[in-house]
């Protein structure tokens, strides 16, 4: 989760945690590692950690420079994704997002959905249908350790 969102919406954060979900650090301001100095990037991750207290980290945009990865891997299990749903795209509808999942998912996939206003309508449509379809196909869901 983005630290700034946790800071702004602590009740929603608690609800997610109490629902049994694992929370991962996603920086405080959704910084792109590629365009950020290592010091600034690490400082931003640390700022988010003040609210999150997680040993999991997922780099925004799935991009991280090697030195940032090296430094963060000392403290975090770094989680990358292999299927981005593009739920944030104004050019896609919920049906398109669901079709992307059906087309590209494979065993072991980590699927990325977003919790932003931009993605809300697609998320609301595609997430429950994706879960239902994935279970029908024999997939299961696991929590990161």
Please provide the spans of the model-predicted regions.
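C-terminal domain-boundary segment and adjacent tail
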Residues: 6-8, 121-145
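Charged helix-capping and loop-helix junction motifs
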Residues: 14, 38-45, 93-98, 124-128
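Conserved, mostly hydrophobic/aromatic
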Residues: 23-26, 48, 57, 78, ...
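Short histidine/acidic/glycine/proline-rich micro-motifs that form metal-
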Residues: 3-6, 29-32, 63, 84-87, ...
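Glycine-enriched alpha-helix->loop->beta-strand junction motifs that scaffold or abut catalytic
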Residues: 18-23, 72-81, 107
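Active-site beta->alpha N-cap acidic-glycine motif
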Residues: 1-47, 53-55, 140
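His/Asp/Glu-enriched short active-site or ligand-binding loop at hydrolase and phosphoryl-transfer sites
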Residues: 63, 69-102, 138-145
């Amino acid at each position: 989760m983005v630290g700034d969102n946790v800071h702004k919406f602590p009740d929603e954060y608690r609800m997610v945690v109490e629902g049994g979900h694992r929370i991962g650090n996603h920086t405080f301001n959704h910084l792109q590692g590629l365009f950020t100095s290592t010091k600034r990037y690490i400082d931003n991750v640390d700022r988010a950690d003040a609210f999150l207290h997680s040993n999991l980290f997922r780099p925004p945009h799935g991009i991280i420079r090697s030195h940032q990865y090296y430094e963060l891997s000392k403290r975090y299990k770094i989680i990358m994704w292999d299927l981005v749903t593009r739920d944030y795209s104004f050019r896609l509808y919920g049906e398109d997002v669901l079709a992307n999942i059906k087309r590209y998912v494979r065993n072991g996939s980590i699927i990325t959905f977003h919790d932003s206003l931009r993605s809300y309508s697609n998320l609301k449509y595609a997430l429950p249908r994706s879960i239902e379809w994935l279970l029908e196909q024999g997939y299961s869901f696991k929590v990161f350790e």
